[in-house]
Amino acid sequence: MESQKQEDNEYIFRSLYPSVPIPDKLTLPEFVLQGVEEYTENVAFVEAVTGKAVTYGDVVRDTKRLAKALTSLGLRKGQVMVVVLPNVAEYGIIALGIMSAGGVFSGANPTALVSEIKKQVEASGARGIITDATNYEKVKSLGLPVIVLGEEKIEGAVNWKDLLEAGDKCGDTDNEEILQTDLCALPFSSGTTGLQKGVMLTHRNLIANLCSTLFGVRSEMIGQIVTLGLIPFFHIYGIVGICCATMKNKGKVVAMSRYDLRIFLNALIAHEVSFAPIVPPIILNLVKNPIVDEFDLSKLKLQSVMTAAAPLAPELLTAFEAKFPNVQVQEAYGLTEHSCITLTHGDPEKGQGIAKRNSVGFILPNLEVKFIDPDTGRSLPKNTSGELCVRSQCVMQGYFMNKEETDKTIDEQGWLHTGDIGYIDDDGDIFIVDRIKELIKYKGFQVAPAELEAILLTHPSVEDVAVVPLPDEEAGEIPAACVVINPKATEKEEDILNFVAANVAHYKKVRAVHFVDSIPKSLSGKIMRRLLRDKILSINKK
């Protein structure tokens, strides 16, 4: 990886691989469904539990029907539809249908509270909602037209089947032309500052991301890949990295609406899943949960798993590889503000070869990356940790109706500031150290929670862990470990403290241990540190 010294002495890093072309004229649905004619009988989505399936023929037909119906109901270019659904077989059709009508897809978490969904609906200026009977109660009072999936007809709502049939009867309308520069998605992200914001993504953004991430897919893989659809489809990785990427490759998505280890393993075996994007807590489950031993793992056709969202502890990776020797583990890195995946392991030059263990991979084609000193903004050379910044055609247009936060995140040169600390080594592999906002400042030293968590997970009695900062009068902040201990373990707080102390520099020592029943995590697998910290502080006050 050659660093490019610019006139202003910036260290800018680019991909080892040549640039890939990005088509100019296509919308995202057109791009994703290119070449679909040969695959109309192939299953595009199947639900792991119910077996309900849709073919590529269904996807093409119903995407058109939905787009026509939404247009006839008054949806216009740039207007938002909020989708409140679990991972169902129709999800891809719904997203593509909204986009084909010129609308903007905004997925919401179906497990969210009514108040949280209301915030997203209001913040996005949504014109309608698509949901199912289970979630209808959450959205019926929001004052918008509601389309409900399923056979059941609900008074006051539009039935999905009826809507599609109405779409059949609609003639072709003179829609305003949809351009690549038009918005097509408005996912909500906490960004680098913690509060939920709408991320404005265009057709061009998402097509550019798919071109970069899929550059290594060989022609013989088209129509062959079976992907597990467990990561929520309302999440950027779910809709782009799973749904759109798999449809582009004419593979099959096995949709799971919730995580259950037995259902998960059954789905992998029964549907011959070859690629499973998952989160680190599931890796932990696969390594440590005795339920796994109930299954004949020799029946697995799984070739690779990809983890993102949180760093994978090196010892956990080793344990997983020992248990699943034929499954390749790829760690990836992405963010909503960059349209999904940004760095990844797959290497077309080496077949399924990957980057170094515990790196998040290499720079994808068409991307530029630099690392800056968070205090001075100065760009840094190889092997020097700094804030990861990325520049490409995948960078969002900004946060919806929030110029102040946009300006904090994207600078005048078009660099997206990720809020993550990392470095690039001599071979072009990138390593993420931690998030700026999660670094613990102990007596002026920066301590990365992820590093301490990785060490603690090597302890045989530790089943899960999270390290959080606690305020301290003398040190500023101290690292405190919230530990899920094996019920049969005899270790006390002091044993855990000594275990870490034997493995780190003095300033990185864990200063307090709290035994907890579980570690709260978001649906995407990220540790909810603030929740843990607040809980400890409230206990300490009593």
From Swiss-Prot:
Membrane-spanning segments: none
Membership in a protein family: Belongs to the ATP-dependent AMP-binding enzyme family.
Tissue expression notes: Mostly confined to anther tapetal cells.
GO biological process: fatty-acyl-CoA biosynthetic process; pollen development; sporopollenin biosynthetic process
Molecular function per GO: ATP binding; long-chain fatty acid-CoA ligase activity; medium-chain fatty acid-CoA ligase activity
The keyword Magnesium belongs to this UniProt entry's keyword annotation: yes
Keyword Nucleotide-binding: yes
Cofactors demanded by this protein: Mg(2+)
Positions with a binding annotation for CoA: R258, K443, G444
Function: Carboxylate--CoA ligase that may use 4-coumarate as substrate. Follows a two-step reaction mechanism, wherein the carboxylate substrate first undergoes adenylation by ATP, followed by a thioesterification in the presence of CoA to yield the final CoA thioester.
Quaternary data: Interacts with TKPR1, PKSA and PKSB.
Region (SBD2) residue spans: 332-399
Comment text on domains: Both substrate-binding domains (SBD1 and SBD2) are involved in the substrate recognition, and are sufficient to confer the substrate specificity.
Domain of life: Eukaryota
Reaction catalyzed: (E)-4-coumarate + ATP + CoA = (E)-4-coumaroyl-CoA + AMP + diphosphate; (E)-4-coumarate + ATP + H(+) = (E)-4-coumaroyl-AMP + diphosphate; (E)-4-coumaroyl-AMP + CoA = (E)-4-coumaroyl-CoA + AMP + H(+)
Top-level enzyme category: ligase
Any one Pfam family match given in the protein's UniProt record, by short name: AMP-binding
InterPro entries cross-referenced by the UniProt entry: AMP-bd_C, AMP-bd_C_sf, AMP-dep_synth/lig_dom, ANL_N_sf
EC number: 6.2.1.12
Protein name, UniProt field: 4-coumarate--CoA ligase-like 1
Keywords: ATP-binding, Endoplasmic reticulum, Ligase, Magnesium, Nucleotide-binding
UniProt region (SBD1), positions on chain: 260-331
Main location: endoplasmic reticulum
Organism: Arabidopsis thaliana (Mouse-ear cress)
Binding site for (E)-4-coumaroyl-AMP: Y237, A309, E331, A332, T336, K437, K441
Cellular component GO terms, alphabetical: cytoplasm; endoplasmic reticulum
Positions contributing to ATP binding: S189, S190, G191, T192, T193, K197, E331, A332, T336, D420, R435, K526
